[in-house]
Each structure stands twice: as C-alpha cells, then as structure tokens.
Amino acid sequence: MKRLPRLALATALFAGALAGIPSLAFAGNLPAAIDGSVAVMHTNDIHGSYKYSYNASKGTGTVGFDGLAVLYSAQNSAPDLLLDAGDTFHGQSFATMSEGKSIAELMDTFYVDGYDATTPGNHDWSYGANKLRTMTGYSTTGTPFAMLCANAKSTSGVWSSSITKTLDRTWEDSEDHSTFDYKIKVGVVGAMDESLGSSLRADLVAGTSFSSAANAINAEAEQLRKEGCDVVVCIAHTLDAKTFATRLRGVDALIAGHEHINLNEKVTGADGKTIHVVEAGSSFAEVGMLSIPYKYDTNGTETTDDDTVTVPADDSNEKLYTAKNVNDLLADPDKGSDYQSRLEAVRNKIKPLDEDFENESNKVLGTSTTNYFYGEDAAGTHGWEMVRTTDFRPSKEGDTTKAQTIGHVICSSYLDLTGADLAIENAGGIRGGIAAGNVTAGNVIAISPYGNTVETWTMTGADCLAALEHSLQISDDCNDSYELQQAYVAAGHTEQEAHDKYKWRDDSGSVLSFGGINVTIDWTQPEGKRIVSATLTKDGSTLDPAKTYTVATNNYIITNTTDFPTFAHATKYTEWGTCEAALRALIGQDSWESKMASLAGTISFGSAAVDPTPTPAPTPKPSPKTDTTATKVITKKTTGKLATTGDRTLAVVGACLIGGIIVIMLGIIWKRRR
C-alpha cells in the first residue's frame, strides 16, 4: 500500500508498534467506502464491418475500428475492458474472403492492446469450429483477445470459458492529497445460446457439443467469485437477452448479441440481484459504453485483507456512440487533429488488409458464355426496376434476352450448396449481374454485397405457393408503375420526375426470384391463382400443397412475415455461409452454367398469358330527362374478365317487374272508380 505523506505514515507505524496494535488506522481521511466504476466498451454483430464512414445528410454511418479508436481515446480515462458479443468474423466480403482473419487481426491491433475477449455468434462458425476456436493471435504486434464459449465442448481442443483482469485503482484525499491504492478484480465469462447451435451445419461443428449456456455461465461465475472476482461480466450471443438474464446467477452485467437491437434494461437475475442487460445494434452502427459501479469497503483501515466490494447494479448506466459522434470528435476545433491522427493510425493498419482484399477480389473464379444481366446491359442500366418486373412477364416483343436471369443464377447457387428442394431470393438483395467473359470475385460481391447468409427452412407446398403468388402480385403492380414511368420519360420528363409521379410499392424489393421449380404463369387468372403449374426440377414431381419441402433462401427475406405471412409457418433447418460465398462456389466449378440450368427451373406462360388489358366500361349516355352534369366513372383494374354491362337477362327481368307493377296500379285505379 502507498501512503502519503511519508512522515505521517512513519509516525503511525511507530505509534502502533508501541501500542502493540495489529492493524493500523489510516493517518488521512480514508472513507469507510470508496465509490468507483468499471468502464466496459462493447460491440456485437459487426458482421465484418470494419471501416469508419459517415453520411452527414442522413446522420448515419459505420463506426469501424478506426472510429472505435477515436471513441476509445476520447474517454476521460481509458476503458477497463473492450468486449464483443459475437457474429464478428463473418458477413462482409472483407471478412469472409480471409475466413475472418482480417477482422481478427484488427481486433488484436487496432488500438492499444485491442479487444480483451469475444464470444462466438452463430455465423462465426461458418469456417469450422477449430478455425473459430483459434481465431486470435494473428498479429505479431498485438495482444491476442480471448475466444470464450463456456458451454462448448470439443473433441479436438479446449474452449476457454472466462478471463480475469485486475484493475489498479488509486483513491486520493482531496484535502491532504494522501493516496490509497487498491485493486478490483473483474471476471468475464462468455457463451452462445445452445439453441443457436442446433441450426449450424453439422460438418462445421463436428465433434463440438453445446450444453446449457445459462448453466455453464452460472457455474463459471461461481468459480470466478471463488477466485476473488469483485465484478463479473457475461458476454453472450443469445436469442432473447432479457429472458436469458433472468436465468443467470452471480453476474453483474450481460453484454448481448444476436438480436440486432439497442438494448439497455435492468433485469432481475435468478439470484434476485439486478443484472444490467445491454446490446449495441449491429454492423458497427453503434458502440456501447457500460459503466458498472462498485463500492469498495475499506473498513477505515489501510489493510486490504478484509476489504469487500459490492456492485449496486441498479446504478449502472449505458451510453451508445454512433458514427455521428466520431464525426463530431473529428470536427472538434481543439482536439480534432489529435482524433484524426488516431483515425489515420488505424487506417494505416487497415490499408494492407484492404490491398489483400482487392487482390482477392480481382481473382477470376470462372467464365460465363452468356450475359446474366442486372438490367438492360452489363452496366446495370435500369437493373433496380427490371429485376422487379421483367422475369415474370411474357415479352411483348418476343425478346427474352432481357429477362433477369441473374436471379436464377443466385437461386441455383443456393440449391447447389444446400441440396434444398426450392430456392428463393428477393429482388432487393440483388445488386449486380454477370457479363459474358471472365467472372471475378469482385463481380460476385457486387451481385450480393450485403453479407446476408444462406439458410434452409422447411415449409409446406401450400405456403410456398402462397408466397410466390403474392410475389407475382407485387411484380404486377411494379410492372404497372414501370410502364407508366417509361411512358412519362418518353414524353420528355426526367427519370426522377417519373419515379416521383408513379411511385413503386414500398415492398417492391420483396419480389421473389425462385429456383428448383418449373412454373407456368397465366396472367388472365385472378390474384392467387396465376400459377397453373409447378413441378420440381430435381424429380419432375408436382409441387404438393400438403407436402413439406426444404427451401433455401437468404436470412433477410425469410423473416419478412409482413409481406409473406406464410413464412411465419416455416421452421429453420440449417445455417450455411454467405450468399456471395455460395455464388463463388458455383461459378468456380467447371461447366457451372450447365449445372445452373439444370437446377434453376423455368418460367413459362399459359396460352392466354398476355398482359391483361381490362375492357373499359362503356360511358353511360345521359337521358334527356336526367341531370347532364358530367359524372366521372372510375374503374378498377382487374386481372380477370370484366363484368359486361347491359346484360340481356337482367334487362328482361327488369322489364317484367316494371310491367307487373303497372298492371297492379291500373287494377287498383279501375276498382276505385267502380
């Protein structure tokens, strides 16, 4: 222990020795309890995002590792811990093309000692359990972070459950400036919800099993307390963080991942104590700063053997930082240049990783003998519009070269990867095409840039058909908008003016490309009955409404139960790799186009399958005895046959009724006159 001034300490020691006192009272004004806090900076679900960017007009952006260094250095004192709650090494192509190595290296080296620990998210297992377990220490200059998963057991290696970190603290007397040194020991335990493990590809987790995450955390927390930890923090990738926290004991705070939400709530744990539960969004859009308070009980003496620490978690607080905060710091008139230096220092570490990524992106995966355009040409002209419309309409000019076959390529890659019965991909997830010639990894990334992952789900044939039918209706409405926009542009207006006047449906991105089935569409049929034939490409069997099928799709559209209510009936089966990785795997094969053609299926149209043009209702001729004020007749477009006005049967019935009424009235008059 350190005591100042030294003269006061010497006097106390001498007096104590004379009196034979075993413990010594502090010569200054040492309080009975010292208030302090443990600062934990944290991230989750960054999904391979890594570089700072900011859109001032929208006020949104990505913090990235370089922005994180700015936020880290801007704190009044350095955070005590930097933790991550999973889904870190997989997502963006920058991460997946190096199998997570690029992200792991930045976590080790981006600033000071880098991260202290992370825990696996469900997507992080995409490179295999052994690769993930050793996903640290790539950099020779950084301090390796810990990969924690207390509930994972592997036949090929041991998973770490926890780490401890001892924090040096100093209290200073405000009057005589004497100081008192003490230590706070913090334990960190990590785990992944065992239910997430059940959806992972079996080959990726071969030899690895998952026990109850809550039980494993509780057991490890108890052990950490026995080892003298004053504060215990849990990092967990879990389906429902708040519910999960109610099952925990001996934990002061839960830093969660997986839900992609901003969470900041206090929950009562299984031991009756408060647990602060936090989560910081996703994709590095936010960074959290959790302050965990403690009271260090000194007993008013300089000895620390019998000192105790309590954590009043009810008083803890959380703050979220975004790219806007980074932008504000960089623009600070006093310290902005210092923060800019921090940013550039990390970017210098990112630069060689970017160069490696660019080299990988330029590698040729395979060749294409034809165009699979996104739009009218290789440049993607009108791709956004055409991927929502063209594939599902019989061409009026007989030109099939503009059909958006890129959707079929994508769906085929999903089928090839998973062996599923059917595949679907939403138009909003497609952002590029393939031109004839060499196909590079960069071309594939442009097609599927979002880092979405392939998943297989089970659903009935009836639910599949209902989703496809609704997609056709969305596409039909999109087609109407697009034709009106084209006509408006042809009349001399700009494309933006056309878009503003004839707007797209809000759910236009939910138009589905599909694969694994041969579909015949009859546009003369009403909504919900336009698919008149659907057979599987794998065996030629008819899609059975009562049968259950395996459907491969991306993890985004399958959760859209607003546009597709029947998706709520689906059951998740397996998680695979990223969508762009599936494309890379297909295009890298010899004769990949032949395989694609055999998997994709076809879209054809019934004998009467033409763009439905409703027959306009005839304008009624005004009677000389009626009001001749103009009346606007509004007709609603239908896809079936319009009802015919002036029906002959109705006219005969009406005439009979009128004649009968006249006869009755004449009879009454004749009777009264008699």
What are the functions of these language-model segments?
Residues M1-A8:
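Bacterial N-terminal signal peptides that target proteins for export
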Residues A10-G20:
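Bacterial N-terminal signal peptides
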Residues L18-I34, A643-T644, R648-L650, W670:
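Sec-dependent signal peptide cleavage junction
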Residues G28-T322, T401, I406-V409, T574-T578:
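Acidic, metal/ion-coordinating pockets
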Residues I34-A39, S49-Y52, V63, P144-N151, ...:
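Feature captures C-terminal
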Residues H177-F180, Y294-V439, I587-V610:
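A short C-terminal boundary segment appended to hydrolase-like catalytic domains
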Residues F605-D647:
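C-terminal low-complexity, Ser/Thr- and acidic/Pro-rich disordered "stalk" regions positioned immediately N-terminal
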Residues A655-R674:
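C-terminal membrane-anchoring or membrane-association module
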